[in-house]
Amino acid sequence: IANIYDMAMKMGAPVIGLIDCAGLRLQEATDALEAFGSLYFKQAMASGVIPQITAVFGMCGGGLAVVPGLTDFTFMENKEGKLFVNSPNALEGNIDSKCDTASAEYQSRTAGLVDAAGTEEEILGQIRSLICMLPANFEDDASYEECTDDLNRICADLANAAEDTGIALATISDNNIFFETKKEYAKEMVTGFIRLNGMTVGAVANRSKVYDEEGNAESLGCLLYTSPSPPD
């Protein structure tokens, strides 16, 4: 894996890791720990140079759990994906039925480590969509693609999306495509990528409501203040 990072940085190509691993073997002892350290070092050196994406499809525990934390984007499979440094049952009284801290739901909603969760097919599709929006490396200008959408078109329903800015961002984006990151974490804020006139643009916005596919609204009751503290 460390050699793959060397080649990726030399070529200026993204690294995508698909993880389903039971962890290191105790028989390998310090050799395995040294290998983890080497991988962490390569990831740190690649940070900001090439995109790093991790998808957890099965077990990802112990020292390997640090890897998703060092990558730029992390995805998890809903049912089989498990992400933990210490096994959840290492905590007294912590059972899966009470709080599965290794699950995709917990890691995306509470820990905020996971950008998106879903089935294997959904995750692979999301990775493809994300890769299309990102440059291959920090020197690449390939985050631009030919645009067939009119930048000056009228967004007739934009006012109706004022409360849920995720919808507003999709409305103004080329072909109404918005890739949202950390979708389940801190829903009062929206972050992600859109395209404007073919160019990838990072987006951040606050919102007060979240609308589902059926139009039902979840009120968040949050406001964004520009001053250090809320007014009296």
Give residue ranges: language-model regions.
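A structural preference for short, pocket-lining loop segments at secondary-structure junctions
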Residues: 1-26, 193-207, 212-216, 227
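Short alpha-helical segments and helix-capping/turn motifs at coil-helix boundaries
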Residues: 1-3, 59, 188
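Short low-complexity stretches enriched in small and charged residues
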Residues: 8-12, 32-33, 154-163
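Short glycine-rich loop/turn motifs
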Residues: 13-14, 40, 51, 187-191, ...
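Conserved catalytic cores of soluble enzyme domains
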Residues: 19-139
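Intrinsically disordered, low-complexity segments enriched in small/flexible residues
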Residues: 110, 121-223
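Conserved small/polar residues in nucleotide/adenosyl-binding loops
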Residues: 225-232
